[in-house]
């Protein structure tokens, strides 16, 4: 079942609301307070900073558990050129293996969504956009950094303002060609880094796009690495379902 645009509930007070089996996507719970709730067999993902469950700060516990489950996460927080190069090499190797695995399936299957999440092809298109946002717009300062096939979430109400084609339907090979070029850009940028360059503050161009505030080069690269790692995890998860079908 596709998602519907949700109601504006900022400041609302709800009692005895039944959300059993509900699906909430891109929901903002900043400052929300939920009491006397039942979270049996619930699945929550997202940013958890400041979240408390029964009086306990959750984020540090989740971070520690994820570090045990995924030891490679420490690589993604590298703060020097060599460490970043090693982290990116790990990302590239994982995606190369996963794309080879995905090619065993039909292209139609790779455009199928699992549980209404992005398809494999859509995931690759989103990562093109992520690179355009954080590398081309921020680190390189390009005014119009976006490839038209980049894919944003529902939060972007006017993709055309960024130069994105909302109705684009490129083939897997076409997407992979753009994706390869973007990954090469990341690799070349990291290879040329110095420790001083990592501390440089990037000012976003005065043009439509995201982000809209300053970040260091290191912070931008950390976002790219985390986007790549998280979406690779989702892609592998969904490929397993598609293979089973």
Which residue stretches match the model-derived regions?
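Proline-centered turn/helix-capping motifs that create local helix->coil transitions or kinks
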Residues: 143-144, 187-199
């Amino acid at each position: 079942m596709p998602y519907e645009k949700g109601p504006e509930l900022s400041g609302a007070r709800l009692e005895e609301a039944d959300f059993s089996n509900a699906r909430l996507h891109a929901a903002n719970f900043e400052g929300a307070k939920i009491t006397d709730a039942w979270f049996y067999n619930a699945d929550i993902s997202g940013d958890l900073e400041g979240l408390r469950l029964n009086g306990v700060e959750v984020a540090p516990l989740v971070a520690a558990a994820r570090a045990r489950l995924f030891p490679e996460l420490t690589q993604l927080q590298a703060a020097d050129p060599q460490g970043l190069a090693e982290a990116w090499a790990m990302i590239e190797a994982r995606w190369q293996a996963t794309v080879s695995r995905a090619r065993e399936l039909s292209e139609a299957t790779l455009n199928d969504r699992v549980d209404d999440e992005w398809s494999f092809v859509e995931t690759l298109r989103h990562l093109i956009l992520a690179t355009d946002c954080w590398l081309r717009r921020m680190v390189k300062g390009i005014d119009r950094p976006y490839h038209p096939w980049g894919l944003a979430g529902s939060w972007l109400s006017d993709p055309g303002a960024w130069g994105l084609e909302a109705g684009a339907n490129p083939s897997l090979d076409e997407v992979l060609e753009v994706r390869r070029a973007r990954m090469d850009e990341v690799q070349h940028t990291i290879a040329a880094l110095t420790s001083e360059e990592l501390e440089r503050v990037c000012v976003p161009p005065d043009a439509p796009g995201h982000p809209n505030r300053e970040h260091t080069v290191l912070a931008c690269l950390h976002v790219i690495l985390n986007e790549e790692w998280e979406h690779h995890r989702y892609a592998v998860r969904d490929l397993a379902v598609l293979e089973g079908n």
